[in-house]
Amino acid sequence: MNLKQKWDVYSRLTRIDRPIGTLLLLWPCLMALMLAAGGMPDLKVLVIFIIGVVIMRACGCIINDYADRDLDSFVERTRSRPLASGEISTKEALILFVILGLSAFGLVLLLNGLVVKLSVVGIILTIIYPFTKRITNMPQMFLGIVWSWSIPMAYAAQTGEVPMEAWWLFAANWCWTVAYDTMYAMVDRDDDLKVGIKSTAILFGKYDRQIIGLFQLAALACFIAAGWSADRGLLYGLGILTFVGFSTYQQMLIFDRERAPCFKAFLNNNWAGLALFVGLGADYLI
């Protein structure tokens, strides 16, 4: 395997070629940094968190594919993944995971002790998540914790503490993650039922759209509470309204529960997150 082929395998293993996950992690992290700083966060902290999000998303993808390597070949969307197709060995994948994980931890060591402690919890949660799909019908709820963990870390890095305001944002992102990852799980539901992978899309069954809607409403309420506790104004409110518009559009997309529209609804959440981030940023700047 030449260098170009190796890069292709690594980029697919870490999903560098598919940045949607990185972006969905990044928007709430950047919002947390802004809220904690009351505007523009410390540049050093900002750079560390952006790089850290990219690295930890890659780590999450590797450990997810390692856990699912014997099942991915039976699922239409995942059968071409490098571990499932045999393009890369499990040993090589785990070595890459360790290298990236240590790199991320090295960045965290540049910050305060509370952030370091929270980061240890974060990496443990990242490792545990893929295996929850074997034991519970609610892995998306565990993923919501994993994907929201950068929020208390961001507050800790910027202020040295994690105030109540941070937990409103944490709750908002948790609800939002459960909603959009259930849309994602709807894409694979038929295959997951065959191979025994558990998900909220299966758990919710015929009430999937309604329960996703409830999580979207809960996320909306908590995003509003987070903004309220930080005394945010009109422009953040416009971001919230745009988020509502995108959420409504997503409900329309998943109405018939077809694979392609459900996947499109999942991807659309990037724009919902961007709207919140831009609204918050504009509210501080203008």
Curated annotation (Swiss-Prot):
Keywords: Cell inner membrane, Cell membrane, Magnesium, Membrane, Transferase, Transmembrane, Transmembrane helix, Ubiquinone biosynthesis
EC top class, as a word: transferase
Localization annotation: Cell inner membrane
Keyword Signal attached: no
BP-aspect Gene Ontology terms: ubiquinone biosynthetic process
Functional note: Catalyzes the prenylation of para-hydroxybenzoate (PHB) with an all-trans polyprenyl group. Mediates the second step in the final reaction sequence of ubiquinone-8 (UQ-8) biosynthesis, which is the condensation of the polyisoprenoid side chain with PHB, generating the first membrane-bound Q intermediate 3-octaprenyl-4-hydroxybenzoate.
NCBIfam families given in the database record: ubiA_proteo
Family membership noted in the UniProt record: Belongs to the UbiA prenyltransferase family.
Identification of the protein by name: 4-hydroxybenzoate octaprenyltransferase
Species annotation: Shewanella baltica (strain OS195)
Species lineage: Bacteria, Pseudomonadati, Pseudomonadota, Gammaproteobacteria, Alteromonadales
Encoding gene per record: ubiA
